[in-house]
Swiss-Prot record:
Source organism per UniProt: Capra hircus
Classification of source organism: Eukaryota, Metazoa, Chordata, Craniata, Vertebrata
Catalysed reactions, as listed in the record: Ca(2+)(in) = Ca(2+)(out)
Main location: membrane
Gene name for this UniProt entry: TMEM63A
Primary role: Mechanosensitive cation channel with low conductance and high activation threshold. In contrast to TMEM63B, does not show phospholipid scramblase activity. Acts as a regulator of lysosomal morphology by mediating lysosomal mechanosensitivity. Important for the baby's first breath and respiration throughout life. Upon lung inflation conducts cation currents in alveolar type 1 and 2 cells triggering lamellar body exocytosis and surfactant secretion into airspace. Also acts as an osmosensitive cation channel preferentially activated by hypotonic stress. (Microbial infection) Involved in the immunomodulatory effects exerted by H.contortus GAL-1 on host peripheral blood mononuclear cells to down-regulate host immune response.
UniProt cross-references to InterPro entries, sorted A to Z: Csc1-like, CSC1/OSCA1-like_7TM, CSC1/OSCA1-like_cyt, Csc1/OSCA1-like_N, Nucleotide-bd_a/b_plait_sf, RBD_domain_sf
Protein name per UniProt: Mechanosensitive cation channel TMEM63A
Amino acid sequence: MTDSPFLELWQSRTVAIRERLGIGDQPNDSYCYNSAKNSTVLQGVTFGGIPTVLFIDVSCFLFLIVVFSIIRRKFWDYGRIALVSEGNSESRFRRLSSSSSGQQDFESELGCCSWLTAIFRLHDDQILEWCGEDAIHYLSFQRHIIFLLVVVSCLSLCIILPVNLSGDLLDKDPYSFGRTTIANLQTDNNLLWLHTIFAILYLILTVVFMRHHTQSIKYKEESLVRRTLFVTGLPKDAKKETVESHFRDAYPTCEVVEVQLCYNVAKLIYLCKERKKTEKSLTYYTNLQVKTGQRTFINPKPCGQFCCCEVRGCEWEDAISYYTRMKDRLMERITEEECRVQDQPLGMAFVTFQEKSMATYILKDFNACKCQGLQCKGEPQPSSHSRELGISRWSVTFAAYPEDICWKNLSIQGFRWWFQWLGINFILFVGLFFLTTPSIILSTMDKFNVTKPIHALNDPIISQFFPTLLLWSFSALLPTIVCYSTLLESHWTKSGENRIMMTKVYIFLIFMVLILPSLGLTSLDFFFRWLFDKTSSEASIRLECVFLPDQGAFFVNYVIASAFIGNGMELLRLPGLILYTFRMVMAKTAADRRNVKQHQAFEYEFGAMYAWMLCVFTVIMAYSITCPIIVPFGLIYILLKHMVDRHNLYFAYLPAKLEKRIHFAAVNQALAAPILCLFWLYFFSFLRLGLKAPLTLFTFLVLLLTILVCLAYTCFGCFRHLSPLNYKTEESANDKGNEAGAHVPPPFTPYVPRILNSSSSEKTALSPQQQTYGAINNISGTVAGQGLAQSPEDSVAAADQED
């Protein structure tokens, strides 16, 4: 059988590339194992340094647990738990539970170790009631990953590991980590087929487990959200009555309940937050004067709390007089801003209809592609106001949850938003492009003899624990940088913000943690030498050295560091503790310190947490075949991560109300992990066996088919909105079943926004049923609280963070 011309051309081109890279048809394996003798990162340690790193990391984890227990006992007021205590001093930490136990007292959890048992005593019903549906879906995702890793651990340790140990390419030293990797097998060993088959099996298992998880994601679609459309592209001078008349004329069968135009209220939100803080401080000192009968004097100047004597320009003044003056000044600014807001429309509107089917019909009319002959037009139904309103430029979508909208960011749109987005991400990319791996830093130290004697680095603590700890530190810093960059992008919804955050953090972490270290310790140096230095004797680079026998030990140590140090630091929440301490020190008065305590609880960042966990999961799956010993440590990581997140979701963070798309996006990213495993096996086969090897061709075919399926799925997902059938959600049996099972009221209840008077007290939060799409009076009054929070204190805190 003769090869096709395409295959012959591809083969000749591949041979040329392999010769350019210094890869022969039968590579000299001993070259890779002996060429790194001057490197200090992967040699000279027992079993890749894993026992030493494991002992150090477990010791650090136990130390962090002790520190956290002490802090939780003595300084517990830097999280959500402080809000409950602040608002209910008579019965501290008493929460209404939906379980049969009724009211449960969590005061005992302030003990040094009693909080550990509380993690296991928490039921999903309690978490659902207190933290919302998103927390349940997040924890369910972790449980599916745990079950998947249990199966993968059994297969990798019971089948793949003995196969790797059966090889004889490396020495027989029982303390050699390389014997446990795929590098221990000869190139002519037929057992290499087993690795590819199990990689395909892992891919199938991942799809099955993730499919089961997605089927369990059932959101209770609120009637208010499904009946409300978000319209952008309106003329700035459009009137509420005109928009309402257009919908009634163009769609006579659809009854409009309410139309609310959007305005630029960013500054108004800021002023209302400051007024709320000022009123709380004024109330605090008023009550203190009534209780003690004495006036309190404060120094309101910047850093005035550090002044020990009264000097000119740093005088003390009466606290009640100061905060009364501040409140009056803020009230004047709020009144002026309310008048200006009326002249700053944004060209957006929320339109609520009588029934879900009406909103769905109009959404289909605006977005579905209607083909007539050879032309496809998407013009919606006209009315007498169509030209005035410019309906051809409208963009119509379902409205997000009221709690999900970032009101202050709605004013940033169009060219300004895109310019801001491109500028932020360009600066982020340039900055992170030069943030290389710590392994390259250590290898550079070796090259320039920074550390003398050079062999002193052969200690496992330096050569394995330090680089993995440094890598984890960089990967811990990266989400923080990306999170702040995402916040600066001014997304309109918190769901979109978390989704973009998850994607960006995951991509950057994968490049930093997995791809760059896998290219070799001096991969950048090799690349530029190969690209520019044509005369150097080292211009011929052996890429098969990427799969060094001990290369997997670095990633095993990274997973161990993430499991113990990473989860320990996440439980401790050191960045939040440092920020809390700094804000408490910089607070000028006792009332300000009280406000700091009440504003210290934040919503859970599902996007960043998903990305962090998926990065480690991808590392585990990518090396589950080539380095099977990594899988049980990955299982330990996910188990500890699950326990830590259960604690933090319930006791430390405020609930968040997000769209379900972020959970489906996490599933899609999880499917990338076994695909990377196939990539690793293909590269190994290509570099070690050659292109003509049957195993290489088979792995390439499987990988190509997998990528094609993923691309097809992604493309269909991108163009799904063009199908009119996509909008017939009210006909779905699943939706009907969800509504029947949830025992919700009929979805045709008319939407009436709860507009609060501007004179309402700022200390009274909205009830969970008081959902509104943010009229001006609502923002100048009390900001809507979180509908999920079951305690008034959480509602107040969520209102303070409303954007």
